[in-house]
Amino acid sequence: MNFCAAIDAALPRAGIAIVAADGHAVCRHFVEGRPGLVETLPPLLQTCLAEAAVKVDAVAVTIGPGSFTGLRTAISLAQGYAAAAGISLFGVTVDEAFAMAFPTLHRPLWVAIRARKDRIFLIRDGIAEAFADADIPRTRSPVAVAGDAANEVAARLAAAGGDVILTNARMIDPVWVAHAALARHEAGLPPRDAQPVYVDPPEARLPAGGLRPEPV
């Protein structure tokens, strides 16, 4: 793999990057806010591809947990691009992406992200769970915390006497997403499926009678 495109829209800030096999970014763009992602992400990918002017061998995309709309938009774009270009597609979880920011971290990394209904999604050891702010689990084991809800979680852990490091990583850098895919490729592991990882089930429901009326 020589160049990997990366697409992320799991959290409030979305981003796209083109990253070389040695890990350096040849293009990187961000867009703030979730509204309008369907309209803004595809042209942003085209802009990044044009600026990089390289042959991309794979595309990586964050698959969650995170925003329903953001995940669906990013995954659909990545799937379409990979299929059209005939290249590999790598799914990358949110905690995998954040872990790429701290290659020398010698303690577990908890990823805390804000969720609907005043909750926090907490990802520990690859498992994501939803908690009310007051119900964040305590630990006396050394941990580090990242994500857009890291401040709240780190404060509660510290107040309970925990050994906690509050990292400076709040949003995902798409370069980390590419790094995770590159690491998986270099380790000889197959790509993770680019299917959304949800903590809550999607709220959309089919009508009880189906999408079409019964024939008469």
At which residue positions do the language-model features occur?
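Generic structural marker for isolated residues within well-ordered, non-membrane alpha-helices
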Residues: L45, A78, D95, A99
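Short glycine/serine- and small hydrophobic-enriched flexible loop segments
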Residues: Q46-T47, A83, H179-A183
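Oxyanion-binding and handling regions
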Residues: M1-A25, R34-E39, F90-V216
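N-terminal phosphate-binding loop and adjacent alpha-helix
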Residues: E32-C48
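Phosphate/pyrophosphate-binding loops at sites that engage ATP/ADP/AMP, CoA/4′-phosphopantetheine
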Residues: L45-A58, I136-R140
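DPxDG-like acidic metal-binding loop motif
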Residues: A58-L89, V94
